UniProtKB/Swiss-Prot annotation:
Protein name: Putative antitoxin VapB18
One Pfam assignment: VapB_antitoxin
Domain of life: Bacteria
Task of the protein: Putative antitoxin component of a possible type II toxin-antitoxin (TA) system. The cognate toxin is VapC18.
Keywords attached to this entry: Toxin-antitoxin system
InterPro entries in the cross-refs: VapB_antitoxin (IPR019239)
Length: 92
């Protein structure tokens, strides 16, 4: 099995070893990988060598009125700030 070795830390993530794109697709790994994470890949000129950085993106429906009330209560401005503040308050 051919693998791609990603050396060094990429955007704060630990190095990973992944199968080449073609091998991963043949094995059906890309479906599970894409379902679990959003992959941002940089393709290099060497055949099958690519670097992936994983970041999680989630789409959810949020009640706009509740979101505005949370903004006022938490004193935040951006959506990420509101969610982070609410999560911190929940775990206290």
């Amino acid at each position: 099995m051919s693998t791609t070795i990603v050396a060094g830390v990429i955007q704060g993530h630990l190095p990973v070893i992944l199968p080449t794109r073609r091998r991963a697709r043949d094995l059906g790994h890309t479906t599970a990988l894409f379902r679990a994470q959003t992959l941002q890949c940089i393709y290099l000129s060497i055949e099958y060598l690519y670097v992936c950085s994983m970041s999680r993106r989630t789409t959810i429906d949020i009640d706009d009125i509740l979101l505005a009330r949370a903004q006022a209560a938490l004193g935040t401005t951006g959506l990420k700030d509101r969610v982070d503040a609410a999560l911190r308050a929940a775990v206290r």
